[in-house]
A protein has these predicted regions:
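Aromatic-lined carbohydrate-recognition surfaces of secreted/lumenal glycan-active proteins
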Residues: 202-212, 268-269, 295-336, 392-404
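Short solvent-exposed beta->alpha transition segments
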Residues: 472-473, 487-534
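Active-site-adjacent "subsite" loops/lids of carbohydrate-active enzymes
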Residues: 83-137, 194, 205, 210-261
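Exposed beta-sheet edge and beta->alpha loop/turn motif
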Residues: 526-575
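Catalytic domains of carbohydrate-active enzymes, especially glycoside hydrolases
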Residues: 138-164, 261-266, 346-349, 427-434
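Short, low-complexity N-terminal intrinsically disordered segments enriched in polar/charged residues
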Residues: 458-484
Length: 575
């Protein structure tokens, strides 16, 4: 999604020209295009003549004054001229940490000691004989030791949590006005960030977006409203802010900008959605600012806005989605604002929370999905891959994996190192080499990350695509979709260049023509030169244009983004 900014001069010119870096993106503006038109390439601020530097600094002061007036209580300064950070990109393998744990004191000797213990365990050596010292090593030190001694190279740290509390003392006026940082557990964030940078650990700021009971209570006019007056609260008694409300957007993004200024490489939005159980609350609530839009439009537009406003800060953006987002289509029936393609197209990373414990009986064919960490993860990720393959430039899939035991589920299994890493193995076999482990208590088993010998490089048969689908199976699925009017399947199975990119336009065209396959027979599937195949098909189509009889017609089967897709032959209609 993002382009690295070559220097902050670019930001300066862009902000002045667009009257931007504040407010909201104008309709149709692509935040990715904003730098290319104004870039002064191959220049560095430090290498400019002193006079030019002075002029730019003077202009920056004026710009910041203008931005401060425009943004008011949401003002966050731009990165300092000459001190910009490069856009850092890694294949993140991450652990989640609360702000409380991240605020613990840490001792580097203890980190190294625990890292040595991990190394000994990985090599099959007896554990060290100093249990007293091990007992004194805190959760933060253990997490940092895991980063030192395993493939884990990233941490996801709460900066605004599920209660709406900001992790540190903030310079943002609105945060201080409402007091959302009253606890500030991450008091010495500079020390932690400095250490993470010194160890090349990728820093991800978790920002809970719209589940924010603190802001909803402090400024209840910006919460989801009840039709008969008052603020809506979910089944747990928690108030949510209104995702259609641009005032809320500014609040969330200002905290994101501050996290970027303080050294985070990525901003991750969790609860970037509406409350679940929408069927229960839809009839009794209202969303000021909705103006007839669907919920997934609000989430899409928020992420577009966040992209635009965070562009000068040189950070990636990621978005967490429910595991069901890999299975549902157009946010139905959930109606919580999470449509996969709309979020993937506005994020650098899309992070489905595919915890096996969160799937009900029968999902993916398993009575207790929690007992099948490998298979559930594999099937869910195959769905995610198929959805991503239908977009030109979607965010990279980086799944959340279950790092906890779900004791509340009848028939559940202990999620030990083997069960947790089974999920990682499933991802790696599908070519997904990033992940985040969730454990709310921040207790992580280091042996989880020594799984590599269990990866099977031959999970696919020769000729199958990444979904383990043969050319014959792909064309059959396509023809069944044409026969059954399954537009979402047709959208996924048609090459991007052969259809409308926008799904709404795609289905509008299909519904206008009323084209449907009445019957078909696959005569044969033959391999062409290279990686393509041809299916020989006979059958009959009906539409508003008449009838089209196909006799041994050739359907091309082509790989796109590692998935077989179908190019249908031209049809001749008889009125």
């Amino acid at each position: 999604m993002k382009k690295a900014l070559l220097l902050t001069v670019i930001i300066l010119v862009f902000c002045i020209a667009a009257e931007g870096c504040s407010g909201f993106p104008s309709a149709g503006r692509d935040p990715q295009e904003s730098t290319s038109e104004t870039a002064i390439e191959s220049a560095e601020f430090e290498m400019l003549p002193e006079k030019d530097q002075a002029e730019l600094l003077e202009e920056r002061v004026a710009l910041e004054a203008q931005r401060k007036e425009q943004l008011g209580a949401f003002y966050v300064p731009l990165p300092e001229l000459g001190r910009e950070t490069d856009l850092k990109t890694v294949k993140a393998k991450a652990l989640y940490l609360t702000a409380n744990v991240s605020g613990f004191n840490f001792n580097e000797d203890d980190i190294h000691y625990y890292a040595d213990c991990i190394d000994s365990m990985a090599k099959g050596s007896p554990k060290p004989e100093d249990p007293d010292r091990l007992a004194e090593i805190n959760k933060l030190e253990k997490a940092l030791a895991i980063c030192e001694s395993t493939e884990v190279n990233a941490l996801v740290i709460d900066i605004k949590n599920d209660d709406g509390l900001v992790a540190w003392k903030s310079d943002i006026e609105i945060v201080n006005q409402i007091g959302s940082n009253w606890s500030s557990p991450l008091k010495d964030y500079e020390k932690l960030i400095e250490y993470l940078k010194s160890q090349d650990i990728y820093c991800i700021a978790r920002i809970v977006a719209f589940k924010d009971p603190y802001f909803a209570r402090a400024m209840n006019g910006h919460a989801i409203q009840l039709l008969n007056g008052g603020v809506y609260k979910d089944d747990a008694g928690i108030a949510w802010v209104n995702p259609f409300d641009k005032y809320v957007w500014q609040y969330i993004v200002s905290i994101s900008q501050e996290a970027a200024l303080r050294g985070f490489d990525e901003i991750q939005y969790d609860y970037v959605r509406f409350p679940d159980h929408a069927a229960d609350y839809n009839p009794i609530t209202q969303f000021p600012g909705r103006d007839g839009r669907d919920k997934d439009e609000a989430i899409e537009e928020f992420l577009e806005y966040a992209n635009s406003e965070l562009l000068p800060y040189n950070v990636h953006i990621s978005a967490d989605v429910f595991g069901v987002a890999t299975r549902s289509w157009d946010d139905k029936p959930e109606d919580i604002g999470q449509t996969w393609r709309k979020i993937a197209n506005q994020s650098d990373y899309i992070c489905p929370m595919i915890y096996p414990s969160h799937y009900g009986p029968g999902i993916y064919g398993y009575a207790v999905p929690d007992r099948q960490p490998y298979h559930v993860s594999r099937l869910a990720l195959m769905e995610a891959i198929e959805r991503n393959a239908a977009q030109r430039h979607p965010g990279i899939i980086r799944p959340w994996f279950q790092g906890f035991t779900a004791n509340w589920i009848k028939g559940s299994i202990p999620y030990d190192a083997k069960a947790i890493s089974d999920q990682i193995v499933a991802a790696m076999e599908l070519g997904i080499d990033e992940y985040i482990i969730w454990n709310a208590s921040n207790n992580y088993e280091p042996m989880t990350f020594f799984y590599h010998g269990r990866i099977d490089p031959n999970t696919r048969k020769p000729g199958e695509d990444i979904l383990a689908r043969s050319p014959a199976a792909a064309v059959k699925r396509y023809l069944d979709a044409e026969k059954g009017g399954k537009f979402s399947h047709l959208y996924l199975l048609t090459p991007i260049s052969e259809r409308h990119e926008d799904y709404d336009a795609f289905i509008a065209q299909r519904k206008t023509s009323l084209e449907i396959l009445k019957n078909y027979e696959i005569i044969n599937v033959v391999k062409d030169e290279g990686e393509t195949y041809t299916a020989i098909v006979s059958g009959e189509y009906h539409s508003t244009a008449g009838t089209a009889i196909i006799h041994e017609a050739k359907y091309k089967i082509v790989p796109e983004n590692n998935i077989y897709k179908i190019i249908k032959p031209e049809l001749t209609w008889i009125p």
